[in-house]
A protein has these predicted regions:
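FIC/Doc superfamily catalytic core
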Residues: 2-371
Length: 371
């Protein structure tokens, strides 16, 4: 069986976990590795944000509930959109709020994602990162479809490929074979749990390594990308980084999809030979998490920070001045939680009349841009 590694972390697993991993020298590498300033800076910033996070959550829990609902919708939409699974905004909102039933395969998968996302939000402390639980999450992800392989590891080989402009299919990466998959996932989970238990490496570095290896194994016939993002949330929450409940990490990934795939392509080179360097993917994920924390702190400020109550006009104006490019009324409302639609509309109208903003288009296609 081919060996599965989390880069720098391969070493003998404790006796309770039987694993094909045998490079014990790599234990020393992770403990003594000299990370560059970019990685260290990201980790330090996220640690600081985590410290402030507790204060925000204790001071204004009720006000943050609106952020939770917005993030759920954005996460469900974005993670599925990355995979080409879509529906209308109106249908999406109804599905997430459990006000309708799915009409087609895409909506079935969207509803499944919403359910697993809710499960992780509410029960992350009780979902161990183990093969059996991962299979259950996959089963629930595809619960509303008639796919027979839901909740099972892949039974046929899969490849990560792309279609060239000429129409030719180009293979980017060949994951492990089906017969190798169960043992590989078992080894991956055992290694993760053992390293975490021994506190050998910061979880912020360990989690991206796990996700990279998970994607290289590609354990399922379908749903690997969505499962990887759900597992990212699960592991972050379990380690105290709950920003994904309030700011959509999946949306941040979807908005930087090209960088996401580029980082994966760099990090999976020579993976089968255990000579890959996961640093590009680690840096990408740290940048995403850091960005989400910065967004979180800005939005927390909006929904109740400071001694003086900020008006909708002041908040929308602040958002508009910081925003690059055009934006819609919906985007302004999402960035300024705590204010009703009419307040956002009035603020946009006043800012347009004052010449701060320029209105582009009409009806549903209306956008605003800073003058």
């Amino acid at each position: 069986m081919k060996k599965v590694v989390i880069f720098f972390i391969c070493y003998l697993i404790i006796n309770s976990c039987v694993s094909p991993i045998s490079k014990s020298d790599d234990y020393k590498k992770i403990a003594e590795y000299s990370w560059d300033n970019e990685v260290l800076s990201y980790v330090a910033k996220i640690h600081e944000c985590k410290g402030r996070q507790e204060l925000y959550l204790k001071q204004r829990p009720a006000e943050l509930e609106r952020l939770v609902e917005i993030a759920k919708i954005q996460s469900t939409e974005s993670s599925n959109r990355i995979e080409g699974i879509i529906t209308t905004n109106a249908r999406l909102k109804q599905l997430v709020e459990d006000k309708t039933t799915p009409r087609n395969r895409d909506e079935m998968e969207i509803l499944g994602y919403r359910n697993v996302l809710n499960l992780i939000h509410e029960n992350y402390a009780y979902i161990p990162v183990e093969p059996g639980y991962i299979l259950q999450l996959h089963r629930d992800l595809l619960k509303y479809t008639n796919l027979t392989y839901r909740g099972h590891f892949k039974t046929t080989p899969n490849e990560i490929d792309m279609t060239l402009p000429s129409g030719e299919r180009h293979v980017l990466f060949r994951p492990l074979e089906p017969y190798e998959t169960p043992g590989a996932v078992e080894a991956l989970c055992c290694t993760y749990q053992d390293v975490l238990h021994r506190e050998l490496v910061d979880p912020l570095l360990l989690i991206p390594c796990f996700i990279l290896d998970f994607l290289c194994i590609h354990p399922f016939n379908d749903g690997n990308g969505r499962m990887s993002r759900l597992l990212t949330l699960l592991m972050l929450y379990q380690n105290g980084y709950v920003v994904g409940q309030y700011i959509s990490i999946e949306k941040a990934i979807a908005e930087t999809k090209d960088e996401y795939y580029a980082a994966l392509a760099q990090a999976d080179q020579h993976w089968h030979e255990e000579e890959n360097d996961p640093t590009p993917f680690i840096k990408y994920m740290l940048a995403v998490i850091c960005s989400c924390y910065q967004d979180f702190e800005q939005r927390v400020d909006l929904v109740g920070g400071g001694q003086k109550r900020v008006t909708a006009y002041e908040r929308v104006r602040s958002y508009a001045m910081e925003r690059l490019g055009a934006f819609t009324k919906q985007e302004a409302a999402e960035a300024c939680p705590g204010f009703g639609t009419s307040s956002i509309e009035s603020a946009l109208k006043k800012l347009t009349e004052e010449g701060v903003l320029e209105r582009i288009g009409a009806g549903r296609k209306t956008q605003y841009v800073r003058r």
